[in-house]
Amino acid sequence: MEELLWLTDLASIESWIENRVECSYPAAVIALIDYGSGNLRSVEKALRYVGAKVQIVTRPDELHDAHGVVLPGVGAFDDCVNSLRRQELFGACREFIGTGRPFLGICVGYQALFEKSEEFNSCAAGLGIFPGRVVRFSTQTGLKVPQIGWNQLEVVKPDCPFFQGIPSGSYVYFVHSYFPQPVNPAIVATRTTYGETFASAIWHDSVYATQFHPEKSQKVGLQLLKNFVNLVL
């Protein structure tokens, strides 16, 4: 895991990013959706570091000219999807995905791509891009919930462009109690085991999504975000 384990807080991770030389790729306009509870600051910094031109958006019309979209995630499933509805971004996200331009969901932004969640007996419907529901880790495993910290990826779709240069066994950073259960196993790009094995990332067409936080996952995470920017260019 090289230098990963000693960087466990957000401030250290942001400092780690800032102390490296920024990439000089042509700017790609990536819309970073602000729905009021996403982890915007660290995601924005990491995207800028790997060469993206980032536009923080709060309105549906701001997605029109974006080359790619990132839906970040911190907080609850209901808060995310209800905020997207209030800001008229719910339908806008669905429409954007329909255009075939790259879309990245992170953590709750990943969960929101599915139909529903059992979190807090949620009644809110997700974006419904993929069939499936979001479930809580079992209490039978004896492990602490939420999962907070580094864990390994098993890359099951090595041809996925988002995971280029990322071997199985790579460590990434998780903070979550819930995870999606896709109905279609063909969309699963990586798996991770924390008492039970779950889909830690998915890929279908131009949609990529991760339960872990690339912006907190240092070298591996930056490579993933760089791969996403390259898809957007």
Whereabouts are the PLM-identified features?
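N-terminal beta1-alpha1 ligand-phosphate binding loop
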Residues: 30-50, 215
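Short acidic low-complexity segments
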Residues: 54-65
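Cysteine-nucleophile active-site neighborhood
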Residues: 75-148
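Pocket-forming structural segment of enzyme catalytic cores
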Residues: 115-194
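Acyltransferase
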Residues: 206, 210-233
